[in-house]
Amino acid sequence: MFLGEDYLLTNRAAVRLFNEVKDLPIVDPHNHLDAKDIVENKPWNDIWEVEGATDHYVWELMRRCGVSEEYITGSRSNKEKWLALAKVFPRFVGNPTYEWIHLDLWRRFNIKKVISEETAEEIWEETKKKLPEMTPQKLLRDMKVEILCTTDDPVSTLEHHRKAKEAVEGVTILPTWRPDRAMNVDKEGWREYVEKMGERYGEDTSTLDGFLNALWKSHEHFKEHGCVASDHALLEPSVYYVDENRARAVHEKAFSGEKLTQDEINDYKAFMMVQFGKMNQETNWVTQLHIGALRDYRDSLFKTLGPDSGGDISTNFLRIAEGLRYFLNEFDGKLKIVLYVLDPTHLPTISTIARAFPNVYVGAPWWFNDSPFGMEMHLKYLASVDLLYNLAGMVTDSRKLLSFGSRTEMFRRVLSNVVGEMVEKGQIPIKEARELVKHVSYDGPKALFFG
């Protein structure tokens, strides 16, 4: 039965295990929600605004089905966009987006209809009636979200995180420090960003010393607002020792507008990653490394719509073990590190790294891998090579608030099924299985990030 009680559960032990974890609170240490939207607590106007307006997963699949861009990110009305989505939605079968959006519809709206061209109008009208009462804060409480960490630039004032402490009841909203723009000396707009950091924190950031002072002040500012983790997007990690004088010379050259060599770019990035590690060591923050996303690969899309519009891809040819060796040994036992990889063929590398370094944790299946298929493969491999018990937990990685419940439910069902299979095969006693799924679903990630 579609999305029935046994959805994704193929054995009796799995059903029993899922029933024990399905109602646990959600702790999400990595997502892309905007704290401002949660604090302002305005209801959505329509189902497209909820499900399609910010979701590049939806945009990509609509494009794959031949839908014109004006019905995706263009000037058409939200209703026209929803109808265009519903028309092609049956083609999404097998992709987790098909299940997530149906789960949202069934669990949150209690509308048990299959999305199609025939049902699109009814769903539009029924959700329209219910949305005025479904404010962001109410939904977060209904989904039992206990803690969530947004992703924020070091220049941020964190004004809405501060307001959330008083305005948002029952949910803790924390920032995550994401200093990618500080490190990416080769990107357009780097100097303007560095100047902005100087203005924000009262430092002369034309010099490396001033820029590092500004970053330290930002780090402290985030700490004061409850931050527990940093996050770093690395296409290919390449961290090694770089003398501070070398980094200082590169910084000044880049700030003056001179073109850098590739070696200078690499040296600057390596130096900055080590500085970020030192900052996190001071505050005992978790360092999250998201590895292997080749961003803005489709040029026309990036030029038209900018980043995060559905033009990013996964790439295989990365030297992760070599590139992280210095960083991991420099902070061996000193820094909690979580590794996420986009290409599943890199899972053996990060799993064995975690096995070698007790302070390193394998992150949840990420992005293109957070489907039932990808999660099952990830969990089974991790259990066989490292410790499933030590998985860093589920993250939604979502820009869409409504998907917290559906993404977490899917993960907990797959986890319960994987562990349930082990019970059925006689590999694990039921008592240990119950403790394992509870730990991975809630206790473990809460202790790692927030303990």
Curated annotation (Swiss-Prot):
Enzyme class, UniProt record, top EC level: isomerase
Recorded metabolic or biological pathway in which this protein acts: Carbohydrate metabolism; pentose and glucuronate interconversion
Entry's EC annotation: 5.3.1.12
Molecular function as annotated in GO: glucuronate isomerase activity
One biological process term in Gene Ontology: D-galacturonate catabolic process
Domain of life: Bacteria
InterPro entries the record matches: Metal_Hydrolase, Uronate_isomerase
Reactions this protein catalyses: D-glucuronate = D-fructuronate; aldehydo-D-galacturonate = keto-D-tagaturonate
UniProt keyword annotations, A-Z: Isomerase
Subunit structure of this chain's protein: Homotrimer.
Xref: NCBIfam families: PRK02925.1 (NF002794)
Family: Belongs to the metallo-dependent hydrolases superfamily. Uronate isomerase family.
Protein name: Uronate isomerase
Organism field: Thermotoga maritima (strain ATCC 43589 / DSM 3109 / JCM 10099 / NBRC 100826 / MSB8)
